Amino acid sequence: MTFIIAVVGATGNQGGSVARSLVQNPSFSVRAITRSPDSQASRSLLSAGAEVVKADGFNGEEMLAAFQGAWGAFVNLNSDDPIWRQPGGPTEFDLGKTIVDAAAGAGVKHLVFSSGPPCVEMTGGKVNMKAMEMKYKIEQYARKLGSFETLTPINPAWYLENFLAEEVAPIFGGFPYFPDEEGYLTFRVPHWAGPGGDNRVPFLGIRDDFGDIIHGIFLNPERYNGRVIHGVSQLRGFDELVADFEQVTGKKCRYEPVLPSWEAFDIHGIPELEDVKLMFAFTQTTGGRYFAPEPSEADTAAELKRTTAVALGKPEPEQHTLRTKDFFRKHFATEK
């Protein structure tokens, strides 16, 4: 017997990783739900073995039909969609509520939702990352609905793949592409936590690990019911991160903290980076805790990755979450 898992946001970074992992398991049948079934990303999923279904997340009837017969669902929403910045337009909560209601109405048993930390609650109202707060609000709505046998929120960490975006590297000091005037690849961002806090930063290999982590949840959804999963590959300090890059590439690197606080971080008026700046406000206020009031941990994600790898019959070296050093070796080393 195969179990249908619907993936909302299947053509994005998160959903694509989930779909690519799940299609490898004959116990699961992947249904990719998208507004653009003719896109290259949709065609790639189709070629990989997924079913591709057209549905608009704002259309409750279309989503209800798309979820019919699904045993499980993974849902991620695009917080960077320009539609959220339109005055008087819909909110991300509106979209999330419609999708969650449709999944519940179709009888989906197991929901995994890509959520965010309760930043307002965790900072006593000092910091409001709009995207994260909206996701958390949707998560709470889904919990209170009480229609799913299991509901597991996952909070994704800092994508390692962000370091592949050469165009934004200058905002972060030039690392890992553009040397400064002294010849260093300088990573210039605020401290993660500051003195006395946990300055280990959660990094995530979205392509290598995220889909396998979600896959692992669906292999045993009851075990992870209600738990906030920390979507992380490795916890690594900024100084350790640049040291890893230097060791792999042989290029001079350094980490220079933006001082005196997150407020001095210049994002050059780019709206999509406003929440990145506020992320540092958040973690400096919480002492480095990003996912929840509890300390960040990588063991659960590593366990889920291993569970998936074993289920797929992968060898031991492929059963571990990605290390930052291996990510840099894969993408930046001249000799791989």
Curated annotation (Swiss-Prot):
InterPro entries: NAD(P)-bd_dom_sf (IPR036291), NmrA-like (IPR008030), NmrA-like_oxidored (IPR051164). Gene3D superfamilies: NAD(P)-binding Rossmann-like Domain, UDP-galactose 4-epimerase, domain 1. Signal peptide: none annotated. NADP(+) binds at residue 135. One of its GO terms (cellular component) is nucleus. Belongs to the NmrA-type oxidoreductase family. The gene is FrzB. It comes from Cladobotryum sp. The keyword Oxidoreductase applies. It catalyses: 4-{[(2S,5S)-5-[(4-hydroxyphenyl)methyl]-2,5-dihydropyrazin-2-yl]methyl}phenol + 2 NADPH + 2 H(+) = (S,S)-2,5-di-(p-hydroxybenzyl)piperazine + 2 NADP(+). Pfam families: NmrA. NmrA-like family domain-containing oxidoreductase; part of the gene cluster that mediates the biosynthesis of the alkaloid (-)-FR901483, a potent immunosuppressant that shows efficacy in animal models and a probable inhibitor of purine nucleotide biosynthesis by targeting phosphoribosylpyrophosphate amidotransferase (PPAT). Within the pathway, FrzB catalyzes the reduction of 4-{[(2S,5S)-5-[(4-hydroxyphenyl)methyl]-2,5-dihydropyrazin-2-yl]methyl}phenol to produce the (S,S)-dityrosyl-piperazine intermediate. Pathway: Secondary metabolite biosynthesis. It is an enzyme of class 1 (oxidoreductase). This is NmrA-like family domain-containing oxidoreductase FrzB. Keywords: NADP, Oxidoreductase. Its EC number is 1.5.1.-. The keyword NADP applies.
